[in-house]
């Protein structure tokens, strides 16, 4: 397990390794399941997770040092007090997604494809936990392998297309989808961060207002008006926007010797550059 310390002597525990807190493959039917079936899936995951923690702390086959360390911990006494100190919901990272006007893919994450109608930026690693366990037969022997784990970094932040949050026009003209947006499995593993959802939600709200005020379909909204909102008031708090000088600012760069500073300092297809002195004037 990957254990990250948090305030008040709490931890954020995540899956780590080939056999851990992920109940691999047992969640596949959740999106299409009834409420009763979803509860059964939840109960199975609860039993698996609590059983794993109990096993580590009590089973004689586990090294004593590890058992003693596990027994130092317990469920948070001040959280979910009406549910046995356990969350009543599963963490749903990815589920059904819309197939919209544009499907974001790995090429977008790697800036091999650049869109001009971006209404938000994403920057997280292309990330997926294992999706299934499969049996491999080789040389007369069988072994179980996990399949689906992906941890691939990206070069720089990339724009998320407005068309990825709008459905195909022939299917619907008054729907905006900032979370279950149109993206491949790999691209969604990068886009799916809460700050990105917040920005896409704000963009969707702005688009809804523009569509209503203009009496148009959401596909006909002038995306430049959404982009202008972020250019003029990026924090949406009426403060002045930052002044960004990079390799697209031709006049400031003229006559100066600029260099790439950090590939992670980029914004879309543009990468920040500074003079050797470090000055950004």
Task: Go through each PLM region and give its residues.
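Flavin (FAD/FMN)-binding glycine-rich loop and adjacent Rossmann-like elements that form
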Residues: 1-236, 240
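Glycan-recognition and processing domains
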Residues: 240-280
């Amino acid at each position: 397990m990957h254990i990250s310390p948090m305030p008040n002597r709490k931890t954020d525990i995540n899956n780590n390794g080939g056999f851990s807190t992920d109940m691999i493959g047992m969640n596949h039917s959740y999106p299409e399941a009834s409420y009763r079936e979803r509860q059964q899936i939840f109960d199975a995951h609860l039993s698996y997770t609590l059983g794993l923690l109990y096993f580590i702390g009590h089973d004689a086959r586990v090294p004593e040092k590890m058992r003693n360390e596990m027994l130092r911990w317990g469920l948070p006494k001040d959280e979910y007090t009406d549910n046995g100190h356990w969350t009543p919901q599963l963490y749903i990272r990815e589920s059904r997604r819309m197939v919209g006007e544009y499907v974001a893919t790995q090429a977008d994450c790697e800036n091999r494809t650049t869109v001009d109608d971006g209404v938000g930026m994403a920057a997280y690693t292309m990330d997926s936990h294992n999706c299934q366990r499969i049996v491999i037969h080789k040389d007369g022997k069988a072994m179980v392998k996990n399949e689906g784990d992906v941890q691939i970094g990206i070069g720089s932040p990339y724009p998320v297309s407005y068309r990825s949050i709008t459905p195909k026009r022939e299917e619907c003209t008054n729907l905006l989808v900032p979370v279950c947006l149109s993206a491949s499995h790999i691209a969604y593993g990068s886009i799916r961060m809460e700050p990105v959802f917040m920005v896409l939600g704000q963009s969707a709200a702005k688009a809804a207002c523009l569509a209503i005020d203009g009496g148009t379909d959401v596909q006909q909204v002038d995306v430049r008006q959404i982009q202008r909102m972020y250019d003029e008031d990026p924090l949406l708090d009426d403060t002045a926007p930052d002044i960004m000088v990079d390799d697209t600012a031709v006049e400031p760069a003229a006559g100066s010797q600029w260099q790439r500073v950090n590939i992670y300092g980029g914004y879309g297809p543009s990468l920040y550059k500074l003079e050797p002195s470090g000055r950004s004037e």
